[in-house]
């Protein structure tokens, strides 16, 4: 939409695609003969978000943990390199976008623009404004007011489940399989954060 070259002003109508809700994911799993209880369904959302393309990659013969291993942890798994591939396909120079997300992944309550700009890899100015706007428009982050930390001050928070999962467990990889992470301190920390994101993305339903 903001392209300055040949495609500028040639958009007839923007379409804002949003991830599936938990209910829609449940319908998709049923269509694909994927058997899960509600707890597993929520955890699958905590990992993959409501992205139907990712959910269609599930193998019905495997458990949720086995699907996570096959798709994300195997060297040639379909989603092993998805985190980097996604952002390099979306943005010409995604390095600062990635730096913003990786910093926000460390702060579940969010950070102000000023706090983000103090990071050497992020910086400030109009570039930060543009990058934050692009990430918000794509649904990776949200901007909100947190009146418990300062009246009227705007905060930015990571709200994309797959991005959080990828940063915590794929980019900063400590183990070779999802099974090794389960019940580790890092797993429980992520689980609390990811569950909050799922709830936040389902406020109308809740």
Positions of predicted regions on the chain:
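Short, conserved acidic/polar surface loops in the N-terminal third of protein domains
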Residues: 1-3, 28, 57
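Short aromatic/basic micro-patch
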Residues: 19, 49, 157
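Accessory nucleic acid-recognition modules appended to NTPase machines
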Residues: 52-206
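The conserved phosphate-sensing helix
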Residues: 36-41, 46-57, 98
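Short polybasic/polar patches that bind polyanions
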Residues: 30, 46, 118
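Conserved small helical "lid"/interfacial subdomain of P-loop NTPases
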Residues: 14-40
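Short regulatory helix/loop adjacent to the ATP-binding pocket of P-loop NTPases
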Residues: 1-12
